[in-house]
Amino acid sequence: LTMIAALATGCAKAPADDGGSTNLTGSLADIVDKIYAAHPVDLSLGTENVDITDTAWMLPQFTGLTSAEGVKEAVVSEPMISSIAYSLVLVRVEDAKNAQSIAQQMKDGINPRKWVCVEADDLAVCGYGDVVMLIMVASDFAEDGITAQAMVDAFQSVCGGKLDFTL
Protein backbone atom coordinates (compact mmCIF):
# COMPACT_ATOMS: atom_id res chain seq x y z
CA LEU A 1 0.00 0.00 0.00
CA THR A 2 2.88 2.35 0.70
CA MET A 3 4.17 1.87 -2.85
CA ILE A 4 0.72 2.60 -4.29
CA ALA A 5 0.46 5.75 -2.19
CA ALA A 6 3.93 6.85 -3.29
CA LEU A 7 3.08 6.25 -6.93
CA ALA A 8 -0.19 8.12 -6.61
CA THR A 9 1.30 11.14 -4.82
CA GLY A 10 5.02 11.03 -5.56
CA CYS A 11 4.95 13.19 -8.66
CA ALA A 12 2.72 16.09 -7.85
CA LYS A 13 3.69 19.45 -9.24
CA ALA A 14 4.79 22.52 -7.33
CA PRO A 15 5.45 26.05 -8.63
CA ALA A 16 9.05 26.58 -9.70
CA ASP A 17 11.16 29.03 -7.74
CA ASP A 18 11.57 31.19 -10.85
CA GLY A 19 7.82 31.54 -11.38
CA GLY A 20 8.01 29.63 -14.68
CA SER A 21 7.22 25.98 -15.22
CA THR A 22 6.19 23.86 -12.28
CA ASN A 23 8.57 21.42 -10.61
CA LEU A 24 7.87 17.75 -10.01
CA THR A 25 7.63 16.90 -6.32
CA GLY A 26 8.52 13.59 -4.72
CA SER A 27 11.74 11.66 -4.86
CA LEU A 28 13.49 10.96 -8.14
CA ALA A 29 13.02 7.23 -7.47
CA ASP A 30 9.26 7.84 -7.21
CA ILE A 31 9.34 9.66 -10.55
CA VAL A 32 11.21 6.73 -12.11
CA ASP A 33 8.49 4.40 -10.78
CA LYS A 34 5.84 6.63 -12.37
CA ILE A 35 7.69 6.55 -15.70
CA TYR A 36 7.74 2.74 -15.61
CA ALA A 37 4.07 2.66 -14.62
CA ALA A 38 3.36 4.71 -17.76
CA HIS A 39 5.62 2.53 -19.95
CA PRO A 40 6.76 -0.77 -18.41
CA VAL A 41 10.28 -1.97 -19.24
CA ASP A 42 11.04 -5.65 -18.65
CA LEU A 43 14.82 -5.63 -18.22
CA SER A 44 15.30 -6.52 -14.50
CA LEU A 45 16.03 -2.91 -13.63
CA GLY A 46 17.38 -1.45 -10.44
CA THR A 47 17.22 2.22 -9.45
CA GLU A 48 20.03 3.72 -7.38
CA ASN A 49 21.15 7.11 -6.18
CA VAL A 50 24.12 8.61 -7.98
CA ASP A 51 26.83 9.98 -5.68
CA ILE A 52 27.12 13.43 -7.23
CA THR A 53 30.26 14.13 -5.19
CA ASP A 54 32.10 11.37 -7.09
CA THR A 55 33.10 13.49 -10.07
CA ALA A 56 35.97 11.16 -10.96
CA TRP A 57 33.78 8.20 -11.94
CA MET A 58 30.15 7.95 -10.85
CA LEU A 59 28.80 11.35 -11.93
CA PRO A 60 30.28 11.26 -15.46
CA GLN A 61 29.58 7.52 -15.88
CA PHE A 62 25.85 7.88 -15.30
CA THR A 63 25.04 11.52 -16.12
CA GLY A 64 27.76 12.65 -18.52
CA LEU A 65 28.49 15.59 -16.21
CA THR A 66 32.01 16.38 -15.01
CA SER A 67 30.84 18.76 -12.28
CA ALA A 68 27.95 18.64 -9.83
CA GLU A 69 27.59 22.42 -9.95
CA GLY A 70 23.89 23.21 -10.15
CA VAL A 71 22.85 19.61 -9.41
CA LYS A 72 20.85 18.69 -6.29
CA GLU A 73 20.58 14.93 -6.77
CA ALA A 74 20.50 12.16 -9.37
CA VAL A 75 19.31 8.59 -9.78
CA VAL A 76 20.04 5.96 -12.40
CA SER A 77 17.88 3.04 -13.48
CA GLU A 78 19.77 0.31 -15.30
CA PRO A 79 19.57 -3.45 -15.79
CA MET A 80 21.21 -5.52 -13.09
CA ILE A 81 23.09 -7.30 -15.89
CA SER A 82 25.75 -4.89 -17.11
CA SER A 83 25.90 -5.99 -20.76
CA ILE A 84 22.46 -4.56 -21.58
CA ALA A 85 22.62 -1.10 -23.16
CA TYR A 86 19.85 0.71 -21.29
CA SER A 87 20.17 3.64 -18.92
CA LEU A 88 17.53 6.05 -17.61
CA VAL A 89 18.88 8.90 -15.50
CA LEU A 90 17.00 11.63 -13.65
CA VAL A 91 18.83 14.70 -12.39
CA ARG A 92 17.21 17.31 -10.16
CA VAL A 93 18.86 20.69 -10.66
CA GLU A 94 19.11 23.46 -8.10
CA ASP A 95 17.46 26.03 -10.37
CA ALA A 96 14.96 25.12 -13.11
CA LYS A 97 16.31 28.02 -15.22
CA ASN A 98 19.52 26.01 -15.69
CA ALA A 99 17.89 22.68 -16.51
CA GLN A 100 18.30 22.90 -20.29
CA SER A 101 21.94 23.96 -20.04
CA ILE A 102 22.72 21.07 -17.69
CA ALA A 103 20.75 18.73 -19.97
CA GLN A 104 22.91 19.78 -22.93
CA GLN A 105 26.05 19.09 -20.88
CA MET A 106 24.66 15.64 -20.07
CA LYS A 107 23.92 14.90 -23.72
CA ASP A 108 27.35 16.11 -24.84
CA GLY A 109 29.22 14.23 -22.09
CA ILE A 110 27.49 10.86 -21.83
CA ASN A 111 29.27 7.80 -23.22
CA PRO A 112 26.77 5.59 -25.07
CA ARG A 113 29.44 2.83 -25.22
CA LYS A 114 30.08 2.76 -21.47
CA TRP A 115 29.22 -0.95 -21.44
CA VAL A 116 32.19 -1.64 -23.79
CA CYS A 117 30.63 -4.61 -25.60
CA VAL A 118 27.26 -2.97 -26.37
CA GLU A 119 26.15 0.53 -27.36
CA ALA A 120 23.10 2.66 -26.70
CA ASP A 121 22.51 4.20 -30.12
CA ASP A 122 19.09 5.71 -29.31
CA LEU A 123 19.45 8.69 -26.96
CA ALA A 124 17.25 11.56 -25.80
CA VAL A 125 17.44 14.19 -23.09
CA CYS A 126 14.42 16.17 -21.94
CA GLY A 127 13.27 18.17 -18.98
CA TYR A 128 10.41 19.55 -17.01
CA GLY A 129 10.84 22.11 -14.26
CA ASP A 130 13.87 21.14 -12.19
CA VAL A 131 14.09 17.53 -13.44
CA VAL A 132 16.16 16.40 -16.43
CA MET A 133 15.80 12.92 -17.89
CA LEU A 134 18.49 11.25 -19.99
CA ILE A 135 17.52 7.98 -21.65
CA MET A 136 19.78 5.87 -23.82
CA VAL A 137 19.04 2.42 -25.14
CA ALA A 138 20.22 0.05 -27.85
CA SER A 139 17.94 0.24 -30.88
CA ASP A 140 17.75 -3.58 -30.71
CA PHE A 141 15.09 -3.11 -28.02
CA ALA A 142 12.77 -1.15 -30.34
CA GLU A 143 10.98 -4.37 -31.32
CA ASP A 144 10.02 -4.70 -27.64
CA GLY A 145 8.73 -1.11 -27.57
CA ILE A 146 11.71 0.16 -25.58
CA THR A 147 12.93 3.30 -27.34
CA ALA A 148 14.20 6.66 -26.18
CA GLN A 149 11.05 8.28 -27.60
CA ALA A 150 8.77 5.85 -25.74
CA MET A 151 10.48 6.77 -22.48
CA VAL A 152 10.33 10.50 -23.29
CA ASP A 153 6.59 10.04 -23.92
CA ALA A 154 6.23 8.25 -20.57
CA PHE A 155 8.09 11.06 -18.78
CA GLN A 156 5.92 13.61 -20.57
CA SER A 157 2.84 11.75 -19.32
CA VAL A 158 4.19 11.89 -15.75
CA CYS A 159 4.72 15.64 -16.24
CA GLY A 160 1.07 16.20 -17.12
CA GLY A 161 1.52 16.03 -20.89
CA LYS A 162 4.05 18.84 -21.26
CA LEU A 163 7.84 19.04 -21.37
CA ASP A 164 9.90 22.22 -21.21
CA PHE A 165 12.45 20.93 -23.73
CA THR A 166 13.69 17.88 -25.61
CA LEU A 167 17.24 17.62 -26.96
Q: Where are the model-predicted features located?
A:
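Surface-exposed, low-hydrophobicity interaction/linker segments
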Residues: 22-79
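Sec-dependent N-terminal signal peptides
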Residues: 1-2
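Structured segments of extracytoplasmic/periplasmic soluble domains
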Residues: 34, 38, 105-113, 154-162
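A short, solvent-exposed beta-edge/loop patch
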Residues: 80, 117-167
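Extracytoplasmic/secreted envelope proteins and their assembly/folding machinery
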Residues: 28-32, 99, 103-107, 148-152, ...
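Intrinsically disordered, low-complexity, charge-rich terminal extensions
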Residues: 13-26, 158, 162
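C-terminal motif of bacterial Sec signal peptides marking the signal peptidase cleavage site
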Residues: 6-13
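Mid-length scaffold segments of soluble, non-membrane domains
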Residues: 64-109, 113-116
